[in-house]
Design a protein with these regions (language model features):
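Toprim catalytic domain recognition across nucleic-acid enzymes
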Residues: 1-356
């Protein structure tokens, strides 16, 4: 059974049904299905954890307290067969409240203003700068305000008032939890949450790999933890050092903290053996298995690599007391980005033309 409270409860029910004595009944659990880990688990059995069993029973009671009261109401108001639960009912309310806030929001008008600037010195190139304001950042709320600024600066000579150069650091994303895996698989692979979990289950339970037999390729995929075992972290760091060199190998291992309230019962989702590279076993996987395994493998490896470095330049140009700003960043050192770049629902920054 799964290494969680539901799996613990199933084990307890089996023990009770079979009439097995507590003192001679043991449970073996593991988070990855590999020969080494399974043998270690068999060598270290434990008794059934009644705290986990009680937690499952409490969850079951709460499901019924909520579901038995709300489900009949749904049948009356909407249609029969609908169900309600302790999680989905609250989540539905939060979604509805948010939708009400969106509908009641009074939209405000915002304008942006860009200036295409070119240095007087020829053959240097053009770049785009965004309107900033005068002494402090100013928002433009109407076409009239935009036209007023344009009438003032159009055709005027801009003077560079400030240039700032700095090195920026970008750190890798943490390893996957269940929710972040579903989000990233949707963004990058176009897979639904349900399909993501189905394919992850296949990778966890095991795939026939040429020369290896049936191998569980990833750890347990239902987790809210960012924790990694010391053994897995050491294996990743050793792989990074051998494959990419010292520059990509940070001085010490990265440790990620779980969010407040996380159960932290299992490790983060990671490959069970980092040396099984996606492209080397691609022929043994389906297209979906390969894509999802590569996503998990890359994210795990990247989370233990050096930070990426950028050279950032911000230029401020002024005309008639109005300031415009342009920012551009060049990748100086790829770091973890040599392996993996986290997806975004929306671009964090607008693409800027290179600065001369």
């Amino acid at each position: 059974t799964d290494p969680d409270r539901e799996g613990e409860a199933i084990s307890w029910h089996l023990k009770e049904l079979l009439g097995l004595p507590d003192e001679s009944t043991y449970r073996v659990t593991f988070n990855e299905i590999t020969k080494k880990v399974v043998n270690e688990a068999i060598a270290s059995p434990r008794q059934i954890d009644m705290d986990l069993v009680d937690a499952q029973q409490a969850r079951r009671v709460l499901d019924r307290v909520v579901g038995y009261q709300i489900s009949p109401y749904l049948w009356k108001k909407i249609r029969r067969g609908l169900s309600a639960g302790r999680v989905q009912s609250v989540a539905t309310r939060l979604v509805c409240e948010r939708e009400e806030e969106i509908r009641s929001f009074e939209a405000q008008e915002y304008w942006s203003l860009d200036a295409l600037l070119e240095r007087i010195k020829p053959n240097v190139g053009k770049f785009t700068a965004q309107f900033y304001g005068k002494e402090k950042k100013q928002e433009l709320h109407s076409e009239a305000e935009v036209n007023a600024v344009m009438d003032t600066v159009k055709g005027a000579e801009f003077t560079v008032s400030d240039v700032k150069r700095q090195e920026k650091t970008r750190n890798p994303a943490p390893p996957f939890t269940t929710s972040t895996l579903q989000q990233e698989a949707s963004r990058k692979l176009g897979m639904s949450p349900r399909r993501t979990m189905a394919v992850a289950q296949q990778l966890y339970e095991g795939v026939d790999i040429t020369g290896e037999g049936t191998v569980g390729l990833i750890t347990y995929m239902r987790t809210d933890s960012l924790r990694l075992s010391e053994e897995a972290t050491a294996a990743a760091r050793s792989f990074i050092l051998g494959r990419y060199g010292k520059e990509y190998y940070p001085g010490k291992a990265r440790v990620y903290k779980a969010r407040e309230g996380a159960q932290d019962a299992h490790e983060a989702i990671r490959p069970s053996n980092v040396t099984l590279e996606p492209d080397e076993i691609k022929k043994d996987l389906t297209a979906e298995q390969y894509r999802l395994y590569k996503l998990i493998w890359s994210r795990f490896l990247a989370c233990q690599m050096s930070s990426a470095l950028f050279d950032s330049v911000t230029i401020e140009a002024a005309a008639a007391d109005y300031r415009f700003r342009a920012t551009h960043s060049d990748l100086k050192f790829s770091g973890y980005m040599a392996v993996y770049v986290e997806g975004k629902d929306e671009d964090e920054e607008e693409l800027q033309s290179p600065l001369p």
